[in-house]
Structure formats: C-alpha cells, structure tokens
C-alpha cells in the first residue's frame, strides 16, 4: 500500500464505530408485519361457471382436461354464448383470432377457415362427437358448449381437413325453467324456452326441452326471414354403470340469401356499392329454405374404475330449397 493512501485508511477505521452505532437502532427495531394476500382458485369442475372451461371431448375419444390434451383446443362455454346473445356459429367463433369466414353470406349456411384451411362440410362439424351434415346453421339454444380443435384431426374424425374440427356439446337433463324474450334495433323478435328435469321412482329419467322462434330482421333490405327450432335430450340411468342418452333436434329457416360482390379482375372497390342493398332482388323470388334434422344416441357402460365402453349412432339430414 502506498503512503498516500494510509491517511484515508485510518480515517475509514475511525468512522466504522460510528456507522455501527447508527445502524444498531435499525437492527433492533420490531419486524414489519405485512398484510396477508389471499389467492383464490377454482377446480376444473367449477370452471364452466364463466367463460373458462377446463375440459373438452373434441381432443380425444372422451372428455379430458385441457391441460392433459396435446392439442390446441378452444372451448366456448354456455355463459359466453348466452352473454353474446349468439344465434349463429360466427357469433361464437369471432372470439378466436385463428378463425375466419370462408363463405358466410346473410341468409345461407356458414363455412369457416381455421389457420388458413377451409373446413369440410362433410366431416368437420359434429354434435356430441358424431358427424353431421355441415350445410346447415346449427342452432345454439340447446348447446352446452362449442369446442374447436385446431390442426390435424384424423384421430377424431378420420379423413378431415387440416384446419380442424368443430364439436357441439348438447345440454343434458337439469332442473331448469327459463324463458327468453328479446329484440334489437332492427325490430327482430326472438322467443326461446328451456325446460328440464328428472323424474321416475329413482329419478333415473331426465329430459331437456328447448324451443325457439325468431323473426329475423336483417340489416340488408329485403333479407328478412324467420326460424323455428325444437330439441329434446333424454337421459336414462339404467344402473350405476349403464347410461343411455338420446338427442334429436329440428330446425326450419327461411330467409333470402345475400350474394357478395366480386371484382372479376378489377383492382379497386366500387364506390357506389351499398352493403344494405340486396343485389338482384325480385319481389316474386322466394327465400332460401333450410330444413335440418339431427339425431344421435349413445349407450355407455362402466366396466370398472379404469375401463369404459360406449356404442353410438347418429343421423343428420338437411334439405335446402
């Protein structure tokens, strides 16, 4: 150590007791008690009470936790569907940025694009895991949730498009009495009822009935219409191990279809085109009629705590006129 630094060292040693004396009252002070922080969580069984869902059946052969599913799955719960007042699938899927409209004109059935790939009307749409005809606007009044599997889905649906699969889960028997009446700024009138319950000597039979009528008032001129819907879900707990479930739903809709604009080689959008005008409208033309019937049944037997077997069948029919 050089001679020039020795006075500074001695000065530092003299200040050390003073620093310890100043710090000693702080060390002797009472510890500070912080307020407790409460962290509340919920189980997967309770997660369907809001917009979050913890389980889905579209990712495999049975319902499974989303955390344990090695796939990208979006689940839209009953609460979300109800709060959005969704009546079409497009009202639900707009919450997912990976989904776009493939061809979804007013008054016709919708088709969608997932991650840039169009869904196939033959096998990309399902109810309770069973394939349905995709050329229909499936009603949402009797749906518990809508599940979207994004990506390859050959394991779930065989030959399918790489975009994914959309699965509707129907409501099951529950003690419920509900009536919904609504309207909007266009003068649309909507009425729906939801009734269900259990009955029998051992409460082994369950029913869920949904009815709806809608007077459609479109923002497009001359594109009004109407829709009627009815569904029935039946549950039979044959024994502690055996369960039978049956579902049937019918819908009839009439509305003029609104064709889109095509540029046909042009590079600029037309300035006088109005989205409220129905192209090619004739007062003698008839609206597009779509009549759909979807039925499915499932028998399930629990062999033991680890093994379960099921047998299911379905039928879907759509008539477009």
Where are these predicted regions, by residue range?
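Cleavable N-terminal targeting peptides that direct proteins into the secretory/outer-membrane pathway or into
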Residues: 1-33
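Short acidic, glycine/serine/threonine-rich loops at helix termini
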Residues: 48-52, 220-221, 257-260
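Structural signature of outer-membrane beta-barrel domains
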Residues: 44-46, 98, 119, 132, ...
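Acidic/polar loop-and-plug regions of large Gram-negative outer-membrane beta-barrel proteins
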Residues: 214-218, 231-237, 241-302, 306-321
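Outer-membrane beta-barrel proteins
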Residues: 2-3, 30-31, 91, 103, ...
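Acidic, small-polar-rich N-terminal luminal/periplasmic segments of exported/outer-membrane proteins
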Residues: 35-176
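Short sequence motifs at beta-strands and strand-loop junctions characteristic
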Residues: 73, 106, 184-187, 222-226, ...
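Outer-membrane beta-barrel translocator/receptor signature
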Residues: 141-144, 155-232, 236-244
């Amino acid at each position: 150590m050089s001679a020039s630094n020795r006075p500074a060292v001695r000065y530092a040693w003299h200040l050390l007791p003073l620093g310890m004396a100043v710090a000693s009252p702080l060390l002797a002070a009472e510890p500070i008690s912080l307020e407790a922080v409460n962290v509340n969580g919920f189980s997967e069984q309770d997660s369907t009470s809001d917009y979050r869902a913890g389980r889905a059946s579209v990712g495999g052969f049975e319902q499974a936790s989303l955390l344990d599913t090695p796939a990208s799955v979006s689940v839209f719960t009953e609460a979300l569907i109800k709060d959005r007042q969704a009546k079409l699938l497009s009202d639900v899927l707009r919450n997912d940025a990976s989904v776009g409209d493939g061809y979804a004109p007013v008054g016709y059935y919708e088709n969608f694009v997932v991650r840039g790939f169009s869904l196939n009307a033959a096998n990309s749409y399902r109810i309770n895991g069973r394939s349905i005809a995709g050329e229909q606007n499936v009603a949402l009044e009797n749906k518990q949730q809508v599940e979207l599997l994004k990506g390859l889905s050959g394991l779930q649906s065989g030959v399918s498009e790489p975009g994914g699969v959309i699965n509707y889960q129907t409501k099951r028997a529950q003690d419920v009495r509900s009536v919904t009446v609504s309207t909007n700024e266009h003068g649309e009138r909507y009425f729906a009822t939801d009734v269900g319950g259990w009955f029998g000597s051992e409460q082994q039979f369950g029913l869920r009935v949904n009815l709806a009528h809608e007077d459609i008032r479109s923002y497009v001129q001359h594109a009004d219409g109407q829709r009627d819907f009815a569904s029935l879900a039946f549950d039979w707990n044959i024994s502690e191990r055996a369960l039978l479930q049956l579902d049937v739903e019918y819908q009839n809709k009439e509305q003029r279809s609104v064709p889109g604009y095509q540029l046909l080689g042009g590079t600029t959008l037309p300035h006088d085109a109005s989205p409220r005008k129905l192209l090619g409208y004739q007062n003698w033309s008839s609206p597009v009629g779509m009549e759909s019937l979807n039925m499915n049944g499932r028998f399930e037997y629990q062999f033991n705590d680890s093994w379960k077997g099921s047998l299911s069948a379905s039928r879907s029919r759509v008539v477009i006129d």
